[in-house]
Amino acid sequence: MAKLLVKQVRSKINCPLDQKRGLEALGLRKMGQVVEHDSNPTILGMINKVKHLVSVEEAK
């Protein structure tokens, strides 16, 4: 299973509550924070919901 690096690049201020909770579920609390996750349907769905707030790269 591929690993993904997810980085928060935009602020969650003025975002709907479900998007804020999506960022928290991904483990992102601050701008510029990077977390690593497995690429599975659950994580991909969370990333899709906040795709305008994060950048995603495949881990090496």
UniProtKB/Swiss-Prot annotation:
GO terms for cellular component: cytosolic large ribosomal subunit. This is Large ribosomal subunit protein uL30. Belongs to the universal ribosomal protein uL30 family. SUPFAM superfamilies: Ribosomal protein L30p/L7e (SSF55129). The gene is rpmD. Keywords: Ribonucleoprotein, Ribosomal protein. CDD domains: Ribosomal_L30. GO terms for biological process: translation. Part of the 50S ribosomal subunit. InterPro entries: Ribo_uL30_ferredoxin-like_sf, Ribosomal_uL30_bac-type, Ribosomal_uL30_ferredoxin-like. NCBIfam families: rpmD_bact (TIGR01308). GO terms for molecular function: structural constituent of ribosome.
